[in-house]
Amino acid sequence: MFLFGCSKEDVVTPKKEFTLSIDSVLTQSGMRSLPKDKNGFYHLKLDETKNQTIHRITGRILLNGKQPTPSEKVEWESNLFWHLKRNDTIATITKSYINYFTGQYTIVKLPPMIASKDELVPTINGSSYSGTNGEFNTMIAPIYTMKGDTMIVKASNYTSKLFDIKKIVLE
């Protein structure tokens, strides 16, 4: 006994078309993009009063023109790193409170956080996930001694095999 089956319709697998782009490197306020030159390089003025200059990068990943569900992981890379040496001060911490006995506003300087070992510190957060309308964000934090360097930022997505690269001149 033999059994055979036929169908008029082939099973159609939906086509997955991804798009991925880094849309902008935002100003400190986050309200607009940093200026770009004719070569498409962003220009970031480093804050000489602080060790790190923190800025947000935003982009978008879409699946067939729509927000991907579930969210897609975006991995970030940068060509720049800096060294945190053992016994360097990582942060100074202050605590502020109202003294309940005197009623005075009091600020207390706590002991600083000290690095316990040498570390290589990236200038960009390593990953983020897409959200509403496929938007994703990350933070960069180049340090002032990188002035004159060009930061190369890469965003990539494993599922789609797509990536985008932007260059930021540190001034």
Residue ranges and their predicted role:
Residues C6-E171:
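The feature marks long extracellular or luminal low-complexity segments
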